[in-house]
């Protein structure tokens, strides 16, 4: 099954438009970083996340959802920024709790699942961005600012679809307690603990890139063992090839700044354009883009590439450990 996943290339899934949009977004993000720094990135991410979290419904219900989502995001931003890299235990506990709720929220419908996935990613980003701000409240206000911008955009287009929403952002506590006794609930505990461990080790071992380990765990660890193994192998292979390819390109073009920038933008384009063609190919170009970005920013690209590979391997190991625990738990439950 793994070999088939490695060699399978579904060219019908090429998304050229998505690749071009990604290049545009990369350019905009670079400009925002140059002009506004960390807080500009935080506001931009918050606006994007709130817009993605928007669901069809009456304008009033949608704006209430925006307010709720923005408030939760702001609270998580404060907690994540306060913990940051200086309090890895607290950061890991926060990450574990959010990922647990995100996994449980999947039982509440697609809307709740998407919102909590976005909040999980937001916490990861906050931990990474926290070193760029002086006070935790700054990232909280940035998320509220992004929510305000998104709310204005949603209000402007609010005359569109008017159907029922799919559920609340926060699952009722009765649902949380009920799900704890189900296979999904037990998997949510394992996934949350895995994310917490990944956050702690990421901050401890990769202080410059603490998010890479936990992101690998979030992407790789699935309820199905086969899917977890497949995606873990593909991500490892793609990351390894990405470091190798980018390092080779830098050996040849490293002295030509514009050529490296072009390679960086092309990697971003190919990453999304080929995302659904093959996950290993996606991981290859994602890693290459990150290595080129490190070179452009004046960092040691080879060292950063090796760090990403090691972080990915650690994330894969944690995810595989998580699926072993899940499988053992299900076997024990079935036996009893």
Sequence positions of predicted segments:
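Alpha-helical transmembrane segments and their membrane-interface boundaries
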Residues: 1-285, 293-336
């Amino acid at each position: 099954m793994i070999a088939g996943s490695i060699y399978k290339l579904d060219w019908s899934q090429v998304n050229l438009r998505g690749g071009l949009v990604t290049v545009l977004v990369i350019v905009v993000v670079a400009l925002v970083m140059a002009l506004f720094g960390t807080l500009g990135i935080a506001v931009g991410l918050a606006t994007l996340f709130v817009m993605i979290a928007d669901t069809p419904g009456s304008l009033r219900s949608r704006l209430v959802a925006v307010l709720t989502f923005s408030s939760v995001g702001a609270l998580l931003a404060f907690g994540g920024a306060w913990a940051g890299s200086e309090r890895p235990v607290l950061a890991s506990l926060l990450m574990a709790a959010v990922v647990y709720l995100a996994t449980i929220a999947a039982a509440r419908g697609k809307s709740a699942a998407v919102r909590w996935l976005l909040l999980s990613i937001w916490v990861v980003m906050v931990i990474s961005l926290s070193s760029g701000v002086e006070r935790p409240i700054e990232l909280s206000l940035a998320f509220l600012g992004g929510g305000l911008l998104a709310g204005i955009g949603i209000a402007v287009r609010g005359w569109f679809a008017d159907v029922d929403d799919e559920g609340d952002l926060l699952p009722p506590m009765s649902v949380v307690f009920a799900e704890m006794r189900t296979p999904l609930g037990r998997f949510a505990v394992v996934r949350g603990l895995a994310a917490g461990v990944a956050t702690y080790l990421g901050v401890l071992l990769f202080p410059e890139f603490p998010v890479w380990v936990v992101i690998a765990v979030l992407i790789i660890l699935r309820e199905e063992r086969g899917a977890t193994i497949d995606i873990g192998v593909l991500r490892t292979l793609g990351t390894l090839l990405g470091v190798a390819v980018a390092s080779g390109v830098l050996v040849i073009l490293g002295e030509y700044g514009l050529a490296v920038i072009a390679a960086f933008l092309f990697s971003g384009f190919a990453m999304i354009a080929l995302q659904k063609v093959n996950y290993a190919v996606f991981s290859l170009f994602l890693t290459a883009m990150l290595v080129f970005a490190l070179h452009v920013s004046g960092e040691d690209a080879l060292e950063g590439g090796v760090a990403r590979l090691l972080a990915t391997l650690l994330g894969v190991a944690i995810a595989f450990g998580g699926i072993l625990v899940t499988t053992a738990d299900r076997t024990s439950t079935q036996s009893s």
